[in-house]
């Protein structure tokens, strides 16, 4: 699990896809920092 987008998510599949909407539902705190 590497922070490719500077955000560590429990689901690595969401990182390469680049779906902030789905990631926001998982970790809203981390995604807010990415925005």
Curated annotation (Swiss-Prot):
GO molecular function, one term: toxin activity
Superkingdom: Eukaryota
PTM annotation, UniProt: Processed by the macrocyclase-peptidase enzyme POPB to yield a toxic cyclic decapeptide. POPB first removes 10 residues from the N-terminus. Conformational trapping of the remaining peptide forces the enzyme to release this intermediate rather than proceed to macrocyclization. The enzyme rebinds the remaining peptide in a different conformation and catalyzes macrocyclization of the N-terminal 10 residues.
Entry keyword set: Toxin
Propeptide cleavage-removed residue intervals: 1-10, 21-35
Residues in cross-link Cyclopeptide (Ile-Pro): 11-20
TM region(s), chain numbering: none
Function recorded in the entry: Probable toxin that belongs to the MSDIN-like toxin family responsible for a large number of food poisoning cases and deaths.
Family stated for the protein in its record: Belongs to the MSDIN fungal toxin family.
NCBIfam families: amanitin (TIGR04309)
Protein name as catalogued: MSDIN-like toxin proprotein 6
Species per Swiss-Prot/TrEMBL record: Amanita bisporigera (Destroying angel)
């Amino acid at each position: 699990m590497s922070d490719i987008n500077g955000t560590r998510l429990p689901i690595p599949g969401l990182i390469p896809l680049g779906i902030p909407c789905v990631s926001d539902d998982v970790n809203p705190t981390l995604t807010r920092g990415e925005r």
